[in-house]
Amino acid sequence: MSWQAYVDEHLMCEIEGHHLASAAILGHDGTVWAQSADFPQFKPEEITGIMKDFDEPGHLAPTGMFVAAAKYMVIQGEPGAVTRGKKGAGGITIKKTGQALVVGIYDEPMTPGQCNMVVERLGDYLVKQGL
């Protein structure tokens, strides 16, 4: 299965009548492996900050997490594995695997829990595949 198929079929899939606003699979260096049409362009320093937060949980909490210059308030994740952010009625979930970052961005009416489920399910699968 191609990386684009993972995005299209597993991240942008319908969940209880709703879809993520955008999604992508990125390398740890920020290289885009696959993305949905509306996925925002990360800046290199944003990826650096996110990766540092995985290595040093809590690193982004004081400043917030920036994605394409949009600021997300960092909320509880799983240290070293999942980071989550909230912005207004939407948010972001990022799951780190051995080689990739699985990213989902949502807006209402999708819930944070639905976004977490979609992103983390694919991320857990990729971890089991050694990716």
From Swiss-Prot:
One Pfam family recorded for the sequence: Profilin
Keywords tagged on the record: Actin-binding, Allergen, Cytoplasm, Cytoskeleton, Disulfide bond, Phosphoprotein
Domain of life of the organism encoding this protein: Eukaryota
Post-translational modification: Phosphorylated by MAP kinases.
Compartment list: Cytoplasm, Cytoskeleton
Residue numbers covered by motif Involved in PIP2 interaction: 81-97
Entry GO terms, CC: cell cortex; cytoskeleton
One Gene Ontology term of the molecular function aspect: actin monomer binding
InterPro entries assigned to the protein according to its UniProt record, in alphabetical order: PFN, PFN_euk, PFN_sf, Profilin_CS
Presence of keyword Disulfide bond: yes
Cysteines paired by S-S bonds: 13-115
SUPFAM superfamilies listed in its UniProt record: Profilin (actin-binding protein)
Record-listed Phosphothreonine modification sites: 111
Summary of the function given for this chain in its UniProt record: Binds to actin and affects the structure of the cytoskeleton. At high concentrations, profilin prevents the polymerization of actin, whereas it enhances it at low concentrations.
Family, per entry: Belongs to the profilin family.
Misc. remarks from the entry: The variability of the residues taking part of IgE-binding epitopes might be responsible of the difference in cross-reactivity among olive pollen cultivars, and between distantly related pollen species, leading to a variable range of allergy reactions among atopic patients.
Subunit field text: Occurs in many kinds of cells as a complex with monomeric actin in a 1:1 ratio.
Name of the protein: Profilin-9
